[in-house]
């Protein structure tokens, strides 16, 4: 069993896209997977299937029902704003302790081979009134899968996020460079290679938007190999 926090170097870089691809690859290999996103903003109840929670359920092969949405993403807010701002509009005060309690409760009952806990926004985005995603990650202490983009400026955002994670002594399991949708974005392969050159030896995986998800299979196999090593060493 392995557990990872899926973080973003920026907002909308493709965290859920990456999580879904990893879930599909893990299941295709005959292993179990599950996911949890404690807080979600920009949620449209009439289009629940298109939400991050709905996409995660689809990747898990589960129907998008109210009960399952509550299980995978218990705090869902309508406004497309930072979670504490969206929550405030609905009369809810989001706190770090509440998110930690929800996350730890999920971690205590999940036993899949691959367990992904996904943040909201970028590493330094506010996720509660008194916490950023970084604070939540620090409180949980999970190894991190960092998702970066390929838009102009993405390399700087990704490398900055890596440095910030290191200041909290968080383990960085991998960086996934998710291809940005912007057709005018810099060359994807070059962005991946430049990120690799400056990432300090962290494993880098390239995730094209419309290509074969071989990267996801490679990453899930690497994570499975780590699990086997930990088990044999125990």
From Swiss-Prot:
Annotated GO MF terms: ATP binding; dethiobiotin synthase activity; magnesium ion binding
Cofactor(s), by name: Mg(2+)
Pfam families registered for this protein in UniProt: AAA_26 (PF13500)
GO CC field: cytosol
Active site (catalytic residues): 37
Binding site for ATP: 12-17, 52, 118-121, 178-179
Annotated Mg(2+) binding sites: 16, 52, 118
Pathway terms, separated by semicolons: Cofactor biosynthesis; biotin biosynthesis; biotin from 7,8-diaminononanoate: step 1/2
Catalytic activity: (7R,8S)-7,8-diammoniononanoate + CO2 + ATP = (4R,5S)-dethiobiotin + ADP + phosphate + 3 H(+)
Top-level division of the source organism's lineage: Bacteria
Locations listed in the record: Cytoplasm
Alphabetical keyword list: ATP-binding, Biotin biosynthesis, Cytoplasm, Ligase, Magnesium, Metal-binding, Nucleotide-binding
Binding site for substrate: 41
SUPFAM superfamilies: P-loop containing nucleoside triphosphate hydrolases
Major location category of this protein: cytoplasm
E.C. number(s) listed in UniProt: 6.3.3.3
Gene Ontology process terms (BP): biotin biosynthetic process
Record carries keyword Cytoplasm: yes
InterPro entries: DTB_synth_BioD, P-loop_NTPase
Role this protein plays: Catalyzes a mechanistically unusual reaction, the ATP-dependent insertion of CO2 between the N7 and N8 nitrogen atoms of 7,8-diaminopelargonic acid (DAPA, also called 7,8-diammoniononanoate) to form a ureido ring.
Family (UniProt): Belongs to the dethiobiotin synthetase family.
Subunit details: Homodimer.
Protein name: ATP-dependent dethiobiotin synthetase BioD
Organism, scientific name: Phenylobacterium zucineum (strain HLK1)
